[in-house]
């Protein structure tokens, strides 16, 4: 006699859902040594003033601080005429450009009053155009906006946020 295997009775199928753990949203970060336009885009994308200030603190570098001072300090007088600059944008992909604002930061003093007043106006403007042509178009746009004090028109960053993020900056008395 062959015995047939008996089937085990099935248990009732009541499924109890496990509580879902909410993961904290991963904070997007920038690559090491980010370009100034990447930093400003990231800071602008932050929703709160506190988050913007923290982002400015985290990604502080000399080029960023110089651009922000040029833009927000009313005593910094640009020696480059206001308005659009006739230059040919660099069409190289970002990162393969001839230069970056981090490298050009040390030459920005040529373009403000008190920096290199002995420089001929035409030579100064030629140097400015050459610098812009070596930069990625996004960084060149930032320099043009900063020279006219119009950075806040394109990026959601205010003087108060910069002042809070960088309390060591002495504002005023530069010209």
List where the protein language model places each region.
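N-terminal nucleic-acid-engaging modules of covalent nucleotidyltransferase systems
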Residues: 2-175
């Amino acid at each position: 006699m062959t015995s047939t295997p008996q089937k085990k009775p099935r248990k009732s199928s009541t499924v109890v859902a496990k509580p879902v753990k909410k993961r904290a949203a991963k904070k997007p970060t920038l690559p090491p040594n980010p370009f100034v336009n990447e930093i400003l885009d990231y800071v602008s994308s932050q929703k709160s003033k506190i988050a913007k200030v923290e982002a400015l603190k985290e990604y502080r570098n000399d080029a960023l601080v110089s651009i922000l001072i040029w833009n927000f300090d009313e005593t910094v007088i640009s020696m480059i005429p206001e308005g659009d600059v006739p230059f040919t944008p660099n069409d190289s992909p970002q990162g393969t450009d001839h230069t970056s604002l981090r490298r050009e930061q040390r030459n920005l003093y040529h373009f403000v009053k008190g920096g290199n007043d002995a420089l001929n106006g035409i030579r100064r403007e030629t140097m400015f155009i050459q610098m812009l042509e070596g930069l990625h178009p996004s960084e060149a746009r930032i320099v043009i906006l900063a020279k006219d004090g119009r950075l806040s028109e394109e990026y959601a960053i205010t003087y108060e946020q910069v002042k809070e993020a960088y309390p060591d900056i002495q504002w005023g008395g530069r010209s």
